[in-house]
Amino acid sequence: MAGKDEAEGLEARLLLLPPEAAAEEPTRCGGGDGGGGGRKRKKTYLDVLGVCCSAEVALVERLLAPLDGVRVVSVVVASRTVVVEHDPAAAPESAIVKALNKAGLEASVRAYGSSGVVSRWPSPYIVASGVLLTASFFEWLFPPLQCLAVAAVVAGAPPMVRRGFAAASRLSLDINVLMLIAVAGALCLGDYTEAGAIVFLFTTAEWLETLACTKASAGMSSLMGMLPVKAVIATTGEVVSVRDVRVGDVVAVRAGEIVPVDGVVVDGQSEVDERSLTGESFPVPKQPHSEVWAGTMNFDGYIAVRTTALAENSTVAKMERLVEAAQNSRSKTQRLIDSCAKYYTPAVVVVAAGVALIPALLGADGLEQWWKLALVMLVSACPCALVLSTPVASFCAMLRAARMGIFIKGGDVLESLGEIRAVAFDKTGTITRGEFSIDSFHLVGDHKVEMDHLLYWIASIESKSSHPMAAALVEYAQSKSIQPNPENVGDFRIYPGEGIYGEIHGKHIYIGNRRTLARASSPQSTQEMGEMIKGVSIGYVICDGELAGVFSLSDDCRTGAAEAIRELGSLGIKSVMLTGDSSAAATHAQGQLGGVMEELHSELLPEDKVRLVSGLKARFGPTMMVGDGMNDAAALAAADVGVSMGISGSAAAMETSHATLMSSDVLRVPEAVRLGRCARRTIAVNVAGSVAVKAAVLALAAAWRPVLWAAVLADVGTCLLVVLNSMTLLREEWKGGAKEDGACRATARSLVMRSQLAADSQAPNAADAGAAGREQTNGCRCCPKPGMSPEHSVVIDIRADGERQEERPAEAAVVAKCCGGGGGEGIRCGASKKPTATVVVAKCCGGGGGGEGTRCGASKNPATAAVVAKCCSGGGGEGIGCGASKKPTATAVVAKCCGGGGEGTRCAASKKPATAAVVAKCCGGDGGEGTGCGASKRSPPAEGSCSGGEGGTNGVGRCCTSVKRPTCCDMGAAEVSDSSPETAKDCRNGRCCAKTMNSGEVKG
């Protein structure tokens, strides 16, 4: 299909202005105007449905090149998207759309943040052509109906004709031109039905292919439209454009709003959903000094955020630029296919012309058969399916990776991921958490320096460093009531792989590992220091050439690191640790990992890591390097695939890496490798299928069985199959390789829970005595797996007043079971949405035994008579974010106690003015602590309150309200009846958190 003017690849970037003009920095990312530095520039996204293969890339470029003000054009065939960077005054959007639509490319401007998904219904041209063609099949009943086949051609051909003539006028041979030639040939041969079938099949297949492509690109479009366009200045309440927010401005983010900027929380507390960036499916608690990123969702609290980056430099903006660069890159396989396709089309067209003309010139018999054979070959000259086989699969795989929080910088990287045979891990911040703590700190020498002075100097210098150890030293000094002052530090220097240096108050201070001793010309022996101080990592402080202090630090391995390395081993991949830390620290980390690392290399400089990565490539083959710091940048660039860890990692690591994990979950590494291998298999199937179908059609035609409509169906149908096969990479049920129990442990919020879950995973499946009745899910007490049968859930029978058992539907209750009973951990637990259920109950997330429960809540259910959000933890557990769902039609909504004898936070009943009884039960019982507990507003006011608990002064369990009278029933006891119907109803609808009652006071 592609002619001599075909672009070198499916994606192309065309610079249309001279270098001096093109050097102007873009002022906009993802839609909208930008200003400053010259004329305004705008980036516009267009859905161009007429772009189906590489020939249209050159066509789009030639159409937009003559327009004044157009600077850069990017065409992404896989998603049928054209990105134009232009001056809106000289080249408005309407002019760009008009230029493309003149060629019949069906262009439209994509609204900011929209998905670009086309209508699910076929166009009138397709419908009319199909109806007329179907009617023509009855010509055996009434021969004149054969004319309806010609009418089907006339009805369905206009889009093909517009695009075909536009391409032909620019000397471009695309699929529309080839199909029009085939239709004309069939009409000349008198095969009217076949001509109509060609038009109908081609237009229908193109519509289905467009629908599939736009559906595949919808996720990427939404990813690029996450950033809100407005922000609220906290100090004034003024609503401004995010592009007008400057570094240092404080913006207000209310519950349910998108965070508009990257920054640091300065006021308020909340939970933020970061799945759009990191792929993590649970919210992250935020409090003052926590980092937040633009495009994430603030769940349930107010926070004030001090801006740390401009909108164009935010993480979302960087992601957008990364995505565009990835879409415009081509893999080795794609470049090879494009090169072959460039010669395939002209060669087949020449052969088809020879098949048609030579027999005619020689006066051979059966010319009609020769001409049909030529037409079949002409239709087969379009290599659309072959050309699409690689970019569409790569596009879908990169989109799937982005949903998992893995950003891959192009098709070459994706292919290399599937070939990895060895992985080198940095230790600090990659295998370990990078959250150091100072175990001990000692003065050495003749103690001329006082401890307070030395800590002040160290903290002031380390305040200028971003290394994880620096934060530990600053925190240690602050724990001694010493505040750093980095403004007093002069001549600050960083020595990668060694440490840092700074001058303060006339003192020359070196802080680092034992190499720092040699740099500072300190005569002390590290062996002597090692005998004096014991620790995992040892650091030294040299003041004016003399060793002044020695300290030890500890750092724990990340949860899931050992399992990730075992996963890599199951894939036949070698795992190696490369660290600049001491051999003792490396050995300690290996012990925490259970000895899963096959090689350890310690006390390395950045150049040593590069040398070792090159050695791994020579020994094992394609090698991946995973790191997060400045020291890893060179090794990341040297590896076949360099992977940087986390959005908070160093900028140098993210810039030089080939892929970025937006979270710090090491389990994403084997997921990325599995995805790369799956993408390679998909591409291989696409290429093999495309070639096989072409070969079969040509072989059938050569066997003197040329069927024109079958050739068309094979051509466009193969394109559709290639797209659909590639979209299998987007399936949500596709597993990247992390085991479910390991993923659950990786998301545990406390070290105690991670240790408990890790121990549980190694224990026998039989439940112990303290966990009778608990549900076993591979050692991790997570929510039931999708598709689990109803008998695996406990149904609690809670009926409204007057309801009879026989009136209830077959499935009377939907229950979200506790996520983490008996000391387990529960994440993302909630009742399923079920409009016909009579009762929906969200059970406690984190049952007895100190379990942890997060995001527990009943689902919204308009037809439910009662919705109860049960306690999010019991028996010393911890409940976070527990609340009853908002439900205007419910008879009673009860927010039960958050933390029975443990700690309950942010527990509140939903606001519900029309509710007959709304009760916010006590937050914290049995001496526990309850915070943020309040009853919803209701009229008439409730009577009675209770406080205190059997735990004495251990905490305050404050029962906010009761109904009419403070009568409650025992937690876990049977129902209690009372003379008051309302009180009895209260006790039946939910278990209370008090055991006794005395004069309006309920003892917890």
Swiss-Prot record:
The chain crosses the membrane at residues 120-140, 144-164, 171-191, 193-213, 340-360, 371-391, 683-703, 707-727. Residues 931-952 are annotated as: Disordered. It is a multi-pass membrane protein. It catalyses: Zn(2+)(in) + ATP + H2O = Zn(2+)(out) + ADP + phosphate + H(+); Cd(2+)(in) + ATP + H2O = Cd(2+)(out) + ADP + phosphate + H(+). One of its GO terms (cellular component) is vacuolar membrane. Pfam families: E1-E2_ATPase, HMA, Hydrolase. GO terms for biological process: transmembrane transport. Residues 42-108 form the HMA domain. One of its GO terms (molecular function) is metal ion binding. It is found in: Vacuole membrane. Its EC number is 7.2.2.12, 7.2.2.21. Belongs to the cation transport ATPase (P-type) (TC 3.A.3) family. Type IB subfamily. This is Cadmium/zinc-transporting ATPase HMA3.
